Amino acid sequence: IMSRYGDTPEGMVASCMEFLRICRDENFPDVVISIKASNTVVMVKTVRLLVRTMEAEDMYYPLHLGVTEAGDGEDGRIKSAVGIGALLSDGIGDTIRVSLSEDPEAEIPVARKLVDYILEREGHEPVETSPAPGYDPVTADRRHSRVTERIGGNFPPVVISDRSNGDFEFDHASQPDYIYIGKEDPENLPDNFRLLVDAHFWKERPNAYPFFIASEIDELKDYSVPLKFIRLTYRDLTDRVIEVLKQDKSVIVILSTHHRNGIAAERAAMHHLLAAGCDVPVILHRDYRETDIEALQLKAAIDFGTLLLDGFGDGIMLHNEGSETMVTDSCMFGILQATRTRISKTEYISCPSCGRTLYDLQTTIARIKKATSHLKGLKIGIMGCIVNGPGEMADADYGYVGAGKNRISLYKGKECVLKNILSLIHISEPTRPRLI
């Protein structure tokens, strides 16, 4: 299997099917399948492919879902919600486990919130649509869109921060590409950002672009600027509107939804644009009212992450009443990182610990993050033991793996470069480059 498929979703599915065929031939139906990865793209693609392959052979075994070694804190929750939520949104999955590098009692509340949010959609108004011809949810290549001012095409998705509440505090680590300021220029408006301004209040100046709503679509032609934004829903995408979007190459769609099953509505809109041959760049937009930051992270990760893993979205815009805007900015960058559509920070692949972990995992993770958080784009695995560690951190560039009581081994890729050394001492001086 490895020589034919390599380390790919196709290889994972081929391996799984070998065992399932044996179970079927031996008349052993009591099987639940758990097929995971720390990479959400691989995890979702693999499970979707497995379901398709099983159905082709008339197999319908239950599935257990999880993003393995998801990590801790915001990143662990977002990564878990992206992978698990995308599949649950497809109607795939019978049990789930949220894997966090935290105390074990932290996992169940997160899992319950995740499932409860999916269940809120039950009994929703149907969304009438059909898949665009040629679209494959397994491969889910990024939708082709034209490039307008570095939005669309192969450019990484942009982040638009809603600052219409007048909050202009920013975190350097999660600084948005554009900010929406609403109707009027506040006195403390920063001068180094590209701005979205409601069209009727927009004045021509550098780095300021008009923002329209659906009822103002006929006014687009009256604004001669290189970039215009218009907020639309699926129901707004009439033939006439789509023709305007095709003709005006300066327009960017802010795709919004108020449907109880917002993922279905926004998916329908994207397939409608695909089928119509409309290559307008699309920013995915969502509104929430959450005072619980964890709930916001989970809901936004499911809603945005599912669409991004489908190959849809040239940017995201998240608004939440109930939290600081820096929190929503961080959440947006975390979602893009988890879907591998835009890398903005170091990624950590860390296990939830078990009885085989013979060192202080949580303290170690914190120290490694402190020493390496500036290494944008690097993937670091932090594993409790040698049993599963090297395999489950296979996607990492570097690895820190338990080897015995208070002892660890260091990996560069899949190669062990230092064995059985005392834990933590190699990061007690972050300036030591030989170990990084």
Language model features by range: what are they?
Residues 1-18, 161-170, 175-263:
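Active-site beta->alpha loop and helix N-cap motifs at the rims of alpha/beta catalytic domains
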